[in-house]
């Protein structure tokens, strides 16, 4: 049994959706930036139990316009100034359309060679654009929070304590410390907690009048921890904090991390 419509029905529905998207981009400033609904207004328009029968695409698009759109905050709106100062692009929308159609997984080269090789090439372009050394490489993750998590996991293993193999309990290990600005993203705390560092070992470094991490305060915290038997493990610097878009002094922080043999992660997901 085929659940999808025939090609002609799909093509007509896709054209209607693209027409709506094009009009939306062109007329987005006609919408209020913030929705004007009250809590529960959207949910009340839908049945409490899922329907056992589907609906045609044109009916779904009508429901989207009439029921969903009124409850949307328009992040692409020219007068939207909250949170992240970036908007979606038309090219990005089409790219996601093609990606959704392919429905491919790129966890290995074999699962989709094009995904792996395009990822590698795109990161080379980014590396060269930033003027970074030619021996640098990387991977693209789904969120900056995952990047922070993986960086802290790498930092934990770089201590040489083989925590991945032997765990953090049942043997005599020093407490590993993670340092970040008091304005760092919450993913630092969440990642450190998930990886077993413990809340008391997440050290928030004081900021200056520009809300940037103070390198001298970082150096003092690391020195104090070493004197008290803790093992400094990782430093997270932020370029564009969520609260104020502050940029930590990465060079000075990096010099301290290098001197103290701490893993340095730069959370460069601006805001």
Model-assigned labels for residue ranges:
Residues 213-266:
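Active-site phosphate-binding strand-loop segment of PLP-dependent enzymes
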Residues 83, 185, 263-265:
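Histidine-centered active-site/metal-ligand motif
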Residues 8, 12-26, 62, 66, ...:
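A broad, structural surface signal
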Residues 1-135:
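N-terminal entrance/gating region of PLP-dependent enzymes' catalytic architecture
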Residues 184, 240-241, 270:
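Active-site-proximal loop/turn and secondary-structure-junction residues that shape catalytic pockets
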Residues 69, 77, 133-135, 173-175, ...:
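Short, well-ordered loop/turn elements at secondary-structure boundaries
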Residues 2-5, 209, 241:
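A generic structural motif
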Residues 85-99, 103-231:
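PLP-dependent aspartate aminotransferase-fold enzymes
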């Amino acid at each position: 049994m085929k659940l999808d419509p025939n090609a002609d029905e799909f093509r007509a529905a896709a054209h209607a959706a693209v027409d709506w998207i094009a009009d939306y981009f062109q007329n987005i400033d006609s919408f209020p930036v913030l929705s004007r609904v009250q809590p529960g207004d959207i949910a009340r328009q839908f049945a409490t139990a899922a329907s056992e029968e589907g609906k045609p695409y044109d009916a779904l698009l009508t429901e989207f316009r009439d029921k969903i759109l009124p409850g949307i905050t328009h992040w692409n709106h020219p007068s939207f100034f909250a949170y992240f100062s970036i908007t979606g692009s038309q090219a990005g929308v089409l790219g996601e359309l093609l990606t959704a159609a392919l429905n491919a997984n790129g966890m290995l080269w074999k699962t989709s060679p094009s995904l792996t090789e395009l990822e590698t090439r795109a990161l080379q372009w980014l590396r060269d654009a930033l003027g970074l050394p030619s021996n640098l490489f990387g991977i693209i993750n789904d969120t900056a929070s995952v990047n922070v998590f993986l960086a802290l996991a790498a930092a934990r293993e770089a201590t040489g304590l083989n925590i991945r193999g032997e765990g953090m309990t049942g043997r005599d290990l020093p407490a590993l410390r993670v340092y970040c600005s008091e304005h760092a993203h919450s993913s630092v705390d969440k990642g450190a907690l998930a990886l077993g560092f413990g809340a008391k070992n997440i050290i928030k470094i004081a900021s200056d009048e520009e809300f940037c991490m103070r390198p001298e305060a970082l150096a003092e915290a690391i020195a104090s921890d070493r004197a008290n038997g803790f093992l400094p493990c990782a430093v997270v610097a932020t370029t564009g904090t969520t609260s104020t878009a502050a940029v930590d002094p990465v060079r000075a922080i990096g010099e301290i991390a290098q001197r103290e043999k701490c893993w340095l992660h730069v959370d460069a997901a601006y805001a």
